[in-house]
Amino acid sequence: MPLKLDIKRRLTSRSDRVKCVDLHPAEPWMLCALYNGHVHIMNYENQQMVKDFEVCDVPVRSARFVARKNWILTGSDDMQIRVFNYNTLEKVHSFEAHSDYLRCIAVHPTQPLVLTSSDDMLIKLWNWEKMWACQRVFEGHTHYVMQIVFNPKDNNTFASASLDRTVKVWQLGSNFANFTLEGHEKGVNCVDYYHGGDKPYLISGADDRLVKIWDYQNKTCVQTLEGHAQNISAVCFHPELPIVLTGSEDGTVRIWHSGTYRLETCLNYGFERVWTISSMRGTNNVALGYDEGSIIIKVGREEPAMSMDVVGSKIIWAKHSEMQQVNLKTIADGTEIKDGERLPVATKDMGACEIYPQTIAHNPNGRFVVVCGDGEYIIYTSMALRNKAFGSAQEFVWALESNEYAIRENNGTVRLFRNFKERKSFTPEYGAESIYGGYYFGVKTSSGLAFYDWETLQLVRRIEVQPKNVFWNESGSLVCLATDDSYFVLGVDTAQVANAVETKEGLEDDGVESAFNVLGEVSECVKTGLWVGDCFIYTNSVNRINYYVGGEIVTVSHLDRTMYLLGYVPKDNRIYLGDKELNVISFCLQLSVLEYQTAVMRRDFERADVVLPTIPKEHRTRVAHFLEKQGFKSQALQVSTDADHKFDLALQIGDLEIALKLARESENSQKWSQLADVASSKNNMSLVKECMQKANDLSGLLLLSTASGDAQLLEVVGAAGSAQGHHNLAFLSAFLRSDVERCLEILIETNRLPEAAFFARTYLPSQMSRIVELWREKLGKVNEKAGQSLADPAQYTNLFPGLGDALRVEQHLQEERARKAPARLAANLPLNSERHPLQELFAAEQGAAGQHLEEKVKPAYVPAQAVVSSSQVAEPTSAADDDDDLDLEIDGITLDDNIDTTDVNLDDDFLSDD
């Protein structure tokens, strides 16, 4: 049966003819040697070119990464070997290696050795630690040596392919070949070793259009692969998958099964002739080089064939065709297991599998394990790996009952088995693209998903969703349908379905309508998943472990690479995962936490109260966050052990007592500020004052003191502002307290002398001379003329009209400021804009000083145009003067004689002469 290999193109790069490709072991890079003399490094993850080396102006026929040195080695038609640092683009070294075109470079996997082959029919060994000295020359070929490759199982031997129609096997310690393999009728272009330990095989491709598989121990040809229409230019045994890749000048890459040698697939991307193929252990990526560019394909799936039994003690996996077992119970007691770290487990070989495993799955009770691959399945006992059943199938799934399973065949027929015997079979109405196990038997059709009852095959429900996977919880009450970009969590009414199946009531063409109800939809791609109670644990496309419970998603951890869920072990409170390198890691996930969250979502608070004491203290804050999201903030406050979280919760529910206690414990200014805001909304002004003082919120204290009329607090704010350099607050505090002297001193201290001068002119004219002198002294240091231009009011009184009155007003207001009025009288006092100090001074001099304060009423409104200085006070005028002015104005009026006055009636009395 076929391997069913998924093949996806990861990178397509158009370029000049590509003669050689190589993959970097650590970075997502492909190295391309071009016929035009350039070398490219392509990043196949972001599809970008990383580097472009212009090596020479002749073809570069070979290039290799040396990752441990950050090097690229190139061999070209100018007979030169060049060494570049691929990070700095610096040419480290270059030398002439051969007397003809260089064909191939092979780098020793561990030692500082490099092999080169050439059209001069020689193979040479170089040592870069000895100044690139040539340590050995291998002679024996009688034509161009096209390719050389190290034996991955014995790095001291290598093979070479030559146009003399032979393949030779060499040893590093000898100048002559160990033996020669003959069988091709034309020149041999390429050669490669089989990487597995079970077969001593070589593969070669030649101009006779044939690919030959050789047993290099028996020195015989064991298989010949035919099918290409032109010369074979590249061959490759994949280091992990059971496949052989061959490339030809006919433009195709053929993939063959390395066990049966049947053709699996043929790829033709239209890039003309194939020149090179490269693969690497640890990845399913394969690089292809063509006339018109390069391509990277991903062959097969990277998810490892691994499975954990239901108890969680044993893991079975496949390493190539070898089955191995890991027993987690063998981890020594007392071993500290850290989240995300590789577990120190010992593997036990269980023997070879008869098929190449692509998936492995335990049955629900863990007694049996099924291995699927090559279109076949084999059921083994999980302990001894004894064969219990086998057959042909495209898919295999277990039911929740441990002895039931189903298979899907090529023709779309589905067969159900119980105790390894076929029980029923049917062909779904809309075909069967995929099948799913679990509480109900799922079949994905062309139109959606259909669930059937395992016992009767009665249709339970059709759902218009085409999932990639279906995950059931143990009780069958919940199911997750995972699609390409989202997943749906459905509740299942199993009792109603059972009743409908038994009584045939409520059954429709699409099944039982109320069998499923949607509980949630999440736009997230599920890679692997499993249920623990009512919690769905899964890994997503961005390498996170999350779990879904009652509509809430909780992140357990972020992964640094792709991992696959194996299972959850309740007694360990840990989830186990594996990666493609067959490493096992684990993360702590408390079962009691999951049970508590499940109980809360079911609103079973009695059960939640029982479970809560079993939750370790270090996990209670996570539970509190969950309760908060569910709206149970008071309960979250009681459960949480994190002081910051408790403080936030106390603020949210308005519990000022707990919040105050926590704030006093932490002495965090931000918390005091937050508490002040909440206390303000609760009208607890004494607490607001304490919080603002603890938070050193001078602006807030300024507002509070002015709003409450607290002069003492206002003075404290001013002093603190001065001490801490907040001069604006200090100034405002003094100004609000009518301490204009302090305001002036603050302006002087802060070197704001121009402002101080204007302030003194307005409020303290007696200080003007002192300020002007300070200002003149400072300004003179910058511009002496400008300093001298400042006028001192004491010397130039003529330039300051009304200064005398201003000094008298200052004295008067100073006495008034000494009599502090209570804040409660503010509503009865005039605003500053309504007051006229000079008139108040005149009134005071006439014996009515302070009348507006004692009577607690506002004075009569005085217009703003009222006189404010002695120079502006008008002398009293007589009635005779007024008459003279009026006569002058009348004499200046010119009357129009043309005005019709017939309609004007004047009073005779008005016209009569006195």
Swiss-Prot record:
SUPFAM superfamilies to which the protein is assigned, alphabetical: WD40 repeat-like
WD repeat residues: 13-54, 55-94, 97-136, 140-180, 183-224, 227-266, 352-390
Keyword Protein transport set for record: yes
Pfam families: B-prop_COPA_B_2nd, TPR_COPA_B, WD40
Gene Ontology molecular function terms on file: structural molecule activity
Keywords: Cytoplasm, Cytoplasmic vesicle, ER-Golgi transport, Golgi apparatus, Membrane, Protein transport, Repeat, Transport, WD repeat
Keyword Transport: yes
Membrane topology: Peripheral membrane protein
One GO process term, biological-process aspect: intracellular protein transport
Domain of life according to the entry: Eukaryota
GO cellular component, one term: COPI vesicle coat
Subcellular localization(s) per the UniProt record: Cytoplasm; Golgi apparatus membrane; Cytoplasmic vesicle, COPI-coated vesicle membrane
Purpose: The coatomer is a cytosolic protein complex that binds to dilysine motifs and reversibly associates with Golgi non-clathrin-coated vesicles, which further mediate biosynthetic protein transport from the ER, via the Golgi up to the trans Golgi network. Coatomer complex is required for budding from Golgi membranes, and is essential for the retrograde Golgi-to-ER transport of dilysine-tagged proteins.
Assembly and interaction partners: Oligomeric complex that consists of at least the alpha, beta, beta', gamma, delta, epsilon and zeta subunits.
Protein name: Coatomer subunit beta'
